[in-house]
């Protein structure tokens, strides 16, 4: 057993209002420089829709993630020989048309235009070439709120298998927002795809980062990530990606997207996992077994034996206590109401989602008059949304989605009976039993999902870096290269012997 700690996130999709505040604050913080105009470390997609970049879930085209070949886990894009053959041209990479050509407007013409009978016009101008554009054609949220209708919705890879059942009436009854950041996976394919070894997963908290000095701009990480959350800076010729706001998380603060989230949909916490189980879990044959296999990697932070082994692995008590109070542990592992995004990619993602209940319940007419018995068949009869949610969150396993929706429905009915009344207690208890939950668990869920305070939603211990370096030696060191003390093994050797 090799215990590691992972900082993870859960997003409650029922609470997302699609305001894009998270996207704007993230961009103003991290990608407001030349070369990063098209980068959105955090973006909010309207579903059903193609997403950003277009049809990023089409792994047959982009060849992101992992696959099983002869029972062994292999990169879908091929191994080192394949990458060497395509080292100067990556055929699987998304193009500018899949993202978009970022633009601004000629505002100077509005301010300094001469007097005229006609109003001046601010023409769109490319932020890459600096030339005027005839018209913008796409953007990161171009299809927001199902804009584009019948032309855009069929581009969603998750919808294409359901085309026979879907008409335009479908979009009136089912629409959801899907906020996305880097998944900071336990088995990241972007890290394995990099020929330079520039991407790495931090040992202390599991955050996946890019070493800007080691990056050579081969861009295999871009197509290797099935979630398309690694970008190429055309100005610096380096890869960039979401870094989970590590300067903030090291200080015990939430990511900037979480801090500014209007709907308070995000929860951040620590989970403990057995790193030795990750490869076997990602190698299970049936993609629908990957969810349970990933759950099997997580460890119980309340187990005294696990605590002792975690301390032996260098995880201090503050992190163990944070894992015990973690909202991610409660929702993803204990209550099992949060699910991973596309587990079939075999990357073991660590940003999980509570599926939306509203599209299911809004389909029911006169919901207030519906007796408790009616909720169970209502959830079962909504096959199309359940299949759609399953294609995103459970590798197509509708039974997993059904269990989560039943538990969320039981919570809604139970809390309605407690706060408003009018619910038959016997039928309520039958629904709670069918959902395999309890009144105590439901009340805990309702508090965390509905009225949890800041400190309950974000349980983030400060960074564990006190033993990384010799701080006495570094005290007073100058940042100027020519004046700074020598570094490395030779310097440490000399310092220990009083030679410096």
Regions found by a protein language model. Give the residues of each.
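Non-ligating segments of multi-cofactor redox enzymes
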Residues: 1-500
């Amino acid at each position: 057993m090799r215990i590691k700690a992972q900082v993870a996130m859960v997003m409650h999709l029922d609470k997302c209002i699609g305001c894009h505040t998270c996207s704007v604050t993230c961009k103003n913080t991290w990608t407001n420089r030349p070369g990063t105009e098209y980068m959105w470390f955090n973006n909010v997609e309207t579903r059903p829709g193609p997403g950003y970049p277009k049809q990023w879930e089409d792994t047959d085209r982009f060849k992101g993630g992992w696959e099983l070949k002869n029972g062994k886990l292999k990169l879908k894009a091929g191994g080192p020989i394949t990458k060497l053959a395509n080292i100067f041209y990556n055929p699987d990479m998304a193009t500018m048309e899949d993202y978009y050509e970022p633009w601004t407007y000629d505002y100077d013409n509005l301010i300094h235009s001469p007097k005229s009978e006609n109003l001046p016009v601010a023409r769109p101008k490319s932020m890459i070439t600096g030339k005027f554009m005839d018209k913008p054609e796409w953007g990161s949220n171009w299809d927001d709120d199902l804009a584009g209708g019948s032309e855009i919705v069929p581009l969603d890879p998750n919808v294409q298998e359901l085309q026979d059942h879907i008409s335009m009436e479908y979009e009136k009854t089912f629409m959801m927002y899907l906020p996305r950041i880097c998944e900071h996976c336990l088995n990241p394919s972007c890290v394995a795809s990099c020929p330079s070894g520039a991407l790495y997963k931090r040992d202390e908290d599991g955050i996946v980062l890019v070493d800007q000095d080691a990056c050579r701009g081969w861009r295999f990480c871009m197509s290797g990530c099935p979630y398309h959350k690694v970008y190429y800076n055309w100005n610096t010729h380096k890869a960039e990606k979401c870094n989970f706001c590590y300067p903030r998380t090291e200080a015990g603060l939430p990511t900037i997207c979480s801090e500014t989230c209007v709907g308070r949909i995000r929860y951040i916490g620590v989970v403990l996992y057995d790193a030795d189980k990750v490869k076997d879990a990602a190698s299970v044959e049936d993609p629908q077994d990957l969810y349970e296999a990933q759950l099997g990697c997580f460890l119980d932070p309340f187990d005294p034996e696990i605590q002792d082994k975690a301390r032996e692995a260098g995880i201090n008590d503050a992190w163990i206590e944070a894992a015990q109070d973690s909202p991610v542990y409660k929702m993803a592992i204990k209550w099992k109401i949060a699910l991973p995004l596309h587990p079939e990619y075999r990357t073991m993602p660590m940003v999980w989602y509570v599926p939306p209940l509203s599209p299911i319940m809004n389909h029911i007419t006169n919901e207030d008059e519906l007796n408790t018995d009616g909720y169970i068949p209502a959830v079962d009869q909504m096959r199309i949304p359940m299949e759609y949610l399953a294609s995103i969150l459970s590798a197509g396993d509708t039974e997993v989605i059904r269990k989560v929706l039943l538990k969320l429905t039981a919570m809604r009915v139970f809390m309605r009976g407690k706060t408003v009344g009018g619910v038959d207690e016997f039928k309520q208890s039958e629904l709670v039993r069918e959902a395999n939950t309890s009144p105590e668990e439901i009340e805990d869920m309702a508090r965390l999902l509905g009225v949890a305070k800041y400190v309950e939603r974000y349980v983030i211990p400060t960074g564990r870096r006190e033993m990384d370096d010799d701080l006495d030696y570094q005290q007073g060191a100058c940042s100027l290269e020519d004046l700074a003390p020598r570094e490395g093994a030779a310097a440490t050797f000399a310092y220990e012997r009083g030679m410096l």
